[in-house]
Amino acid sequence: MEAVEIKNKWNWGYSVHIIQDGCGTVAVDFEDGYEWGYINGLVVHPSRQKQGIGTELMRKAEEVIKEEGYDEAQLLVEKEREWVYEWYQRLGYKMIMDKDGFYKMRKML
């Protein structure tokens, strides 16, 4: 598993992108002034789903957040993707906001 830090050109923070053997990826954004890491862009190739890769990527994303000195992870889930919402719940995430077709979720690390 490889983690690559990418500074953005707008200077609002930075992102760490985690790649798993070319079959999955996730990003963690760290924005100036926020006290959490924001997890987004979790993708696993369809042929490799249901093999624990998504869970492994999430664990690595949480590890990166802790290494950067934060103790909270947040993410958004589309309401229409109920199975994804339930999967994040199994990983320990709790809904903190229900707005505009999305659930905002948080996990204390």
Question: For the regions a protein language model found, what residue spans apply to each?
Answer:
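Conserved active-site alpha-helix within GNAT-family acetyltransferase domains
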Residues: T55, E67, K79-M97
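Residues that form or flank phosphate/diphosphate-binding pockets in enzymes
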Residues: Y34, G52, W83
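Conserved GNAT acetyl-CoA-binding A-motif
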Residues: M58, I65-V77
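Acyl-donor-binding surface of acyltransferase catalytic domains
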Residues: L109
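Conserved beta-strand-loop-alpha-helix junction that forms the acyl-donor binding cleft
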Residues: L75-V84, G101-R106
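Conserved acetyl-CoA-binding loop-helix of GNAT-fold acetyltransferases
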Residues: V44, K50-E63, R90
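Acetyl-CoA-dependent GNAT
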Residues: M1-G41, H45, V64, D98-D100
